[in-house]
Amino acid sequence: HDEMAQLFWPAMPVVLEHEHYGLSKKRGNWDSELLVESVEAYHASYMSIHWWPREELAECREAIDRINRRIGYRLRMDNASWPQKVALGEAFTIESAWSNAGVAPCYKGGFPCFTLKDARGGIVSVLVDDSLDVGTLPVAAPEQASTLALASTFTIAPRFTERGHCFFRA
């Protein structure tokens, strides 16, 4: 019935609920591989467990580990580079590459955020690049997520020069 999910998963999360594990196993019907395939086919964002969780995890560990690497959205910053030093008032660029390794989009979206700290670990600046909405990153088959390059240019503590009295002080 995964064709029905094709109507919904691009716009809203899909929740999977499987048969009671122990009962299905007792009848000889359980197949962990089908569970993994269902996450892919339905583009599942959530899955409920119907059995004793520790028992199901112990007996289906490999399949559950594979599911956990794919279910929902999996935003990855695949690489990043930045200057060794940044000066106040001067522009600098952070180069990064982003992908979604999950089966579903990040429905609400969001934007990459970078936090710069000083040598003592104190926060100097929190910077957001609103040119990439991570909700637009495509989903793909396992190990085939496409990477999107992003060049984010920021200036910390830019100097403001009042020209023509456009700056209002209260």
Question: Predicted segments — roles?
Answer:
Residues 1-53:
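Catalytic-core regions of glycoside hydrolase
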Residues 115-129:
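Short aromatic-acidic-glycine turn motif
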Residues 59-64, 108-113, 167-169:
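Composition- and surface-driven signal marking solvent-exposed, interaction-prone regions
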Residues 125-161:
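A beta-strand/beta-hairpin structural motif
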Residues 32-82:
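Catalytic cores of secreted or luminal carbohydrate-active enzymes
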Residues 90, 108, 146-148, 164:
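Residue-level preference for beta-strand/loop junctions
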Residues 66-119:
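Surface beta-strand/loop "capping" patches
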Residues 159-169:
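Short glycine/proline/serine/threonine-rich loop/turn segments at secondary-structure transition edges
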